[in-house]
Amino acid sequence: GCPHCGNNLSNAETEIFNMLSTLNPIQRERTILDGKEIDIYLPSHKLGIEYHGLRWHTDFFGGKGRTYHLSKLNDCLYKGVNLIQIFEDEYMNNREIVLNKISHIVGLDNAKPKIFARKCVVHEITKDEAKEFLNRNHIQGFASASLYLGLKYEGSLIAVMTFLEESEGYWNLNRFATEITHNCIGAGGKLFKYFIR
């Protein structure tokens, strides 16, 4: 929904809009942010979705300034609207992950099989196991860490949480992802509790 890109939605925006059609989304909403456009808006969820094409949103092509997207995010938060920002490269490289995450946020994934964390077991897993899982299920893919934890259900890995020890005694939760084909209820809490112990 960029004025430089023409009046048509991009293929990605159209796909996202169509996926959300049962929730009555609004295209190019301009009233909430006093004239600034939100590409796709879901009034029932107070949720906006912005799709940022890389070419037209770079300074080189006369696009947005460095703080434009942050400013729009802050404007949305001030108005009580959560904003999902999707960059073209993320969508093109991780389309299935992006669509699954949006579907989960708005509650369209209720048909997915549910797995409850209480029926699962936490294991320390190998770097290779974490890498394969995160590259398939996390928008940013794998990142090296100091500790790799996996949640397994009947022997299958359904969630991964990784931690990086920045300095002695100071840990950073580096990555968390669940299997995108399932709803893994309570997975984050169970993995984090294991880490704290």
Which residue ranges define each predicted feature?
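Compact, aliphatic and Gly/Pro-tolerant "microcore" segments centered on a short helix or tight beta-hairpin
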Residues: 133, 150-156
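Short hydrophobic/aromatic beta-strand element in the GNAT-like acyltransferase core
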Residues: 147-150, 160
